[in-house]
Amino acid sequence: MRTLLLAAAAIGVMSASAASAQTFTFTTLDNPGDPTFNQLLGINDSGTIVGYFGSGAAGHPNIGYEIAAPYTTYTPVMQPGSVQTQATGINNAGLVTDFWSPTNLGPNGQGAPQDANFGAVRQPVGKNFGFIDTTDPLTAGLPQADQTLGINNSNVAAGFYLDANGNSHGYTYNLATSAYTEIKIGGAGTIAATGINDNNEVCGLYTTTKGSMFGFVRNASGGVVTHFRVPGSKTTQLLGINNAGATVGFYVDGNNLTHGLYYIPATGAWVPVDDPNGVGGTVVNGINNKGELVGFYTDAAGNVHGMLVTVQ
């Protein structure tokens, strides 16, 4: 199993510029269950982080976990009955978004996924947990794919599903009303919603009908969509958003190098976020309202490590 992020409204187009005023401090956090493959995907305002270890290749299932400061104890987050679970987001009440699979077949010989995945939210119930199925009923195709990727403090989640033709559709899901709302962007061929803040602003990514990939932020009403693309990049994806509208994600430059990114609303600038050990690339997946970031990087040996970033 792997994250299937994509390999009309009034529109605001944001030109991006680089900035160097930010200082980042990087901390590597790896679950010892597999120190060769960890990804940190979400963080709340208490600094509690969710992620997973295991590449998803056959025999190396994704095992979700939660970890709180001082970041020494990893608590499993596994959907009941699952073989694999990726814990993807967490709000301040401790609700955790995830997607899970009943199998661990790994990709086929052509690299295509064979493991179906389904969206869910883990909810604290007393000293135990309940799991809410968030899989969009429009999910179709083989294998089925629905991924719930983020949740705000009003318990509205964001994610995407694949239709019978393999096209991705972004959505939000309100846990209180069990209502799905599709995210639509004019001119987009495929859409994935990846994060949502307490203002119900949604971030994500889309491909145009010509195959170009952009990040986006959509306001709560859906009437304004701001499109983001780092100049000269081949791909830009936005994966997390906080209440100030600061977004994080990654871009692929003209040399096919992957860089984490952090967007500063006050200046309109992109700031690259590159872990000094991430010679194989850096991705930022989550941001909280204190400006703490989480993600992962690939080292010189090809191992993937979880990453916590503080911003000064």
Segment roles from a protein language model:
Residues 3-4, 20-312:
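Residue-level hotspots at or immediately adjacent to binding/recognition sites across diverse folds
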Residues 1-20:
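Gram-negative bacterial Sec-dependent N-terminal signal peptides
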